[in-house]
């Protein structure tokens, strides 16, 4: 059987509920909404780490941060590590990546046979003797930036020139590749039957929050202020809180949210351009597997917090759908899944053997039947400045969090308290669940 072509679409920092198909009536995402209508949508997909680089390395490797050695910002996979791109390339795929991958180390390809992106570089801090101090320097600087609300205050109409140029380069690279591979008579097609994995990954809607005047004007008085009065006091979760009326004005917060929405709409439009290019090149996209996701979410001021690096739903939960209408009927899955699971899923969908030692579970059973048997647990974790462990374990509707020996544990019950404002960790009703979570945390090595 001929292996299917795969289109893997990805954004950076896309909050799970800022999508039309997720029930958001304000955002305009017609392309992703249309794709999702014929897809299996995972309503409870989580990132293995709510930090950019670890999340992406876990996605590539199919392993949790502790198991792939990427627990902190700036850590990259060891050269030659098994990735889903390397695995599919070995199985005969042409693997092409356009746009942001955020690989920091010496292995800039990680199994991609072709790569077009503005972030192809080895970070100068990725030198073993300097790595620890470099990460600490980066994070401390980042905390100062967050604490003075710089990104919120400067948000609005404008351009993030570097990110915009990178996304334009990713889009043009994808369009030129599609033309070369499927249309141009001069393209070298020694193996016309070779299957293709094409990944297109944008920076948007990662801050800085800038968008066009047209989109900004449309969203400014429509977007919500995300639970500005809803807070949860905790030494880590409430760190670097930005208070409306004190640190920023309500208008400034609204400007940032409006710009964020505009960035998502523009990314959606560019995804549509890619789909149109494939169709104009004679491709039937119903024959393709199409995946959409993000590395993590964005707080957008919920609980008074912006950006990511939290285990609140807005930060740790991600959009995820997989579309292959000729094989799977559209439906929604409520089970807890993880970005790590994409590796094993791609292997099963393409008839490729799954490498040993992964934390990845194939999602195919859930794609076939939403209620298929499933261990309804998922994990996310990272290390803070100083190497302190932060761990989240979600089982069914309960979400446990561990922040080392000094900060208190947290237990959210998303069924009883979906806004995540009440800590049930000391509630006797949950004592057995807490005991099991602590055992699992110990099994993870924390």
Language model segments and positions:
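Formylglycine-dependent sulfatase
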Residues: 1-401, 408-409, 418-442
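Residues forming the ATP-binding cleft of Hanks-type serine/threonine protein kinase domains
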Residues: 415
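Short arginine-rich
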Residues: 444-446
